[in-house]
């Protein structure tokens, strides 16, 4: 697989000529790669692309895959940011979610990363879990703050179709948390982290001392990016592309004539819709310049803007239209109110 990834990196080097601000190893368990494999991939990235000296180089890792020796090796390779999937501090929930770690490993792995010299660590948490009490959620957040991590990503549990969770809920084996309790946990999340110095810069993301994720911010600001490997997505302004998901087909793509990726040209309506879908999620909002570039508001859309401002869900920052704290609760639905028919 590593050889195939390197081949794709080389094949596509002319697609992204601008300086690279972020390199991200994600989409599974990249921390299972050994030092030599990671080093080989990083060498190919730096060989083929113009990576900025202060680029953010992130590795996703699960607690059970982190040791101090591994962390030191990652640091030595130039990886300068870790994104760790803690998810929960409750062993029963971790087991139920089929995670491979426990509560003790959560604390131990973060400690090891700091001992190895990392100073930019992000952790993922999930709220809205069945049976999660307000006091437990508060306890989770207190632990995270006490760790001193620079970044927190917190997501509400989603119930996907054709999953064990969906089946157990439908058969009354598990009672989902009510929407009102989910909102309460989200409200506590942002107020508690704000009290402890974290900036709520995107619906699900909080940063200490402006340690925003360059990688995620590139998505929200619709910057061009290339995704390498099975199922990876790429974006180039007016075009989206995604690789096939089958590992075998992906790795044998050089010997077969069949397409190993799909792509679509984005219509002006699609670009407009994405501008609001992504922009309304962040504290920077939807840029007035970007709106102007795409032809500006219709009369009906201007009325919608005024209505949202009057209601207190939106404000005009001068440079952009930004959702208020109350508006952020409904970011997706409010962005959809500006969608145009494709």
Where are these regions (language model features)?
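C-terminal scaffold of the Radical SAM
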Residues: 1-14, 19-296
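An alpha-helix initiation/capping motif
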Residues: 183, 325-328
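Extended hydrophobic-aromatic, low-complexity segments
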Residues: 288-289, 301, 316
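Short amphipathic alpha-helical interaction segments
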Residues: 295-309
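A short, conserved structural fragment
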Residues: 309-319
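Minor-groove-contacting beta-hairpin "wing" of winged helix-turn-helix DNA-binding domains
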Residues: 320-324
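Short, amphipathic alpha-helical interaction segments positioned at domain boundaries
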Residues: 328-342
């Amino acid at each position: 697989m590593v050889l195939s990834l390197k081949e794709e990196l080389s094949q596509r080097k002319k697609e992204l000529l601008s300086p690279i601000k972020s390199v991200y190893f994600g989409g599974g368990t990249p921390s299972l790669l050994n030092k030599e494999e990671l080093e080989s991939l990083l060498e190919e990235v730096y060989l083929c692309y113009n990576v900025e000296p202060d680029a953010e180089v992130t590795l996703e890792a699960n607690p059970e895959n982190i040791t101090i020796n591994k962390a030191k090796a990652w640091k030595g390779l130039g990886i300068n940011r870790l994104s760790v999937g803690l998810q929960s501090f409750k062993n029963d929930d971790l087991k139920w979610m089929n995670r491979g770690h426990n509560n003790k490993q959560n604390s131990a792995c973060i400690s090891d990363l700091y001992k190895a010299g990392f100073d930019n660590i992000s952790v993922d948490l999930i709220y809205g879990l069945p049976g999660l009490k307000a006091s437990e959620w508060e306890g989770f957040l207190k632990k995270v703050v006490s760790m001193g991590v620079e970044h927190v990503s917190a997501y509400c549990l989603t119930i996907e179709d054709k999953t064990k969770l969906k089946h157990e809920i439908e058969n009354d084996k598990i009672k989902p948390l009510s929407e009102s309790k989910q909102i309460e946990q989200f409200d506590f999340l942002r107020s508690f982290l704000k009290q402890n110095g974290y900036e709520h810069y995107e619906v699900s993301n909080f940063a200490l001392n402006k340690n925003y994720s360059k990688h995620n911010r590139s998505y929200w600001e619709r910057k061009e990016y290339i995704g390498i490997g099975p199922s990876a997505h790429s974006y180039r302004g007016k075009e989206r592309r995604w690789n096939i998901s089958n590992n075998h087909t992906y790795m044998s793509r050089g010997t077969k004539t069949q397409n190993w990726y799909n792509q679509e040209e984005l219509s002006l309506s699609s670009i407009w819709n994405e501008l609001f879908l992504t922009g309304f999620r962040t504290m920077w909002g939807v840029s007035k310049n970007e709106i102007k570039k795409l032809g500006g508001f219709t009369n009906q859309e201007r009325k919608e803007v005024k209505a949202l401002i009057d209601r207190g869900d939106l404000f005009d920052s001068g440079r952009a239209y930004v959702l208020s704290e109350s508006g952020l609760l409904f970011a997706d639905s409010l962005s959809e109110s500006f969608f145009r028919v494709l």
